[in-house]
Amino acid sequence: MVPVVALVGRPNVGKSTLFNRLTRTRDALVADFPGLTRDRKYGRAEVEGREFICIDTGGIDGTEDGVETRMAEQSLLAIEEADIVLFMVDARAGLMPADTAIAKHLRSREKPTFLVANKTDGIDADQAVADFWALGLGEIYPIAASHGRGVTSLLETVLMPWVDEINPPEEIDEDAAYWAQFEEAVEGKEEPVDDFNPQDLPIKLAIVGRPNVGKSTLTNRILGEDRVVVYDMPGTTRDSIYIPMQRDEREYVLIDTAGVRKRGKITDVVEKFSVIKTLQAIEDANVVMLVIDAREGISDQDLSLLGFILNSGRSLVIVVNKWDGLSNDVREQVKEMLDFRLGFIDFARIHFISALHGSGVGNLFESVREAYDSSTRRQSTAMLTRIMTMASEDHQPPLVRGRRVKLKYAHAGGYNPPIVVIHGNQVKDLPDSYKRYLMNYFRKSLDVMGTPIRIQFKEGENPFADKRNTLTPNQMRKRKRLIKHIKKSK
């Protein structure tokens, strides 16, 4: 069993900074103001061949109301999940009433807890941590997480002995192999091999949309638990949360993202970070669920986000949420509006659901699997060339500069999204209308649904272009004799 280490403490004591250093990532958002982390975030850490799972949590300060209450609940859940707790305090700010309250709760849980005093760089650490002895948690470990000072000592003297106790050495290799395989699958860094089978990898599914359209509610409905903070206020989710799950004997990695709104309305520095994280999650995903609020309709920002998804080549499922409670007349108006504004995306399935009540949610994964299978299905060169030939016979390529464009053969150029490479003469001069015709013809012939398809064109090049003809010595002698003969004849 891989040990679980939770980082808890007041807001802005450096939990996310330490999380990023332990996991050697930038997965947790970090900035110099409180309340940045709202959901518990999991990361894999490895030190000297020992592995453990690290949980970053939102801060607890005892004055929570509204969404902050749910953040505190997430921190308490992380404590229950953990084998070891690192209780972080701010050495510069000194002992606070919230620190005392958290310490009291930790003592009642009887979890192995270690007190870590952060931000000790540039000050007398012994003097700065003196007040924290009153918490009664034993030894205090001073560190500077932003610079890494004291972190190695913390790992060697505190974490490693507990990791070895919870996870004996003989079990580490088996667990390490599992987590290495999982990490490669999630990060998408596996080397391509001839017998590659996309069904062996988890489907990375990103749930995106404008703020407060119900993304986290949908995530929790799918998972069957309050895994992500949900609150009726735009912008509750600020980070992208990666959650492994299994459904119908198929593995998934669910990515709940922050809402994306118009750039002019993004005034909060953290929200700018969150938008970047969301766009990165789209790039990282195999399939994207775009959630739209049925009551608000499709905004320009929805279309902008949709354009980014299509440009990224991600498979797409459109989810119209908050469908419950709408009258039949309003529903017809919404469907007409969808047909009008989304008519250019005829390959994506559209689902009408209520994430809050669960209606229609069960049908989403059939479309997700269909889109993923379409985007990763292997096609032979013979099949693609045959389809290309049929397309050119049904509708001949146009004339370019008085010559007919000739399509020679086609082959696969990549997957997720599927790419078809067509070779021929003057193919780069084809008009956009004929390129769209070819794309739609390939989509119908290959029965591709839920994913965009891309066509690339390559022209045959003259191998002797820009090369001067060089004569052999024998040819040079013949040339001299010929020139000499011509001169004599004159």
UniProtKB/Swiss-Prot annotation:
Pfam families: KH_dom-like (PF14714), MMR_HSR1 (PF01926). GTP 1 binds at residues 9-16, 56-60, 118-121. Residues 3-166, 203-376 form the EngA-type G domain. Keywords: GTP-binding, Nucleotide-binding, Repeat, Ribosome biogenesis. Gene3D superfamilies: 3.30.300.20, P-loop containing nucleotide triphosphate hydrolases. Coiled coil: none annotated. One of its GO terms (molecular function) is GTP binding. One of its GO terms (biological process) is ribosome biogenesis. The keyword Repeat applies. InterPro entries: G_ENGA (IPR031166), GTP-bd (IPR006073), GTPase_Der (IPR016484), KH_dom-like (IPR032859), KH_dom-like_a/b (IPR015946), P-loop_NTPase (IPR027417), Small_GTP-bd (IPR005225). The keyword Protease does not apply. Residues 377-461 form the KH-like domain. PROSITE patterns: G_ENGA. GTP 2 binds at residues 209-216, 256-260, 321-324. Associates with the 50S ribosomal subunit. GTPase that plays an essential role in the late steps of ribosome biogenesis. Belongs to the TRAFAC class TrmE-Era-EngA-EngB-Septin-like GTPase superfamily. EngA (Der) GTPase family. This is GTPase Der. It comes from Enterobacter sp. (strain 638). The lineage of its organism: Bacteria, Pseudomonadati, Pseudomonadota, Gammaproteobacteria, Enterobacterales.
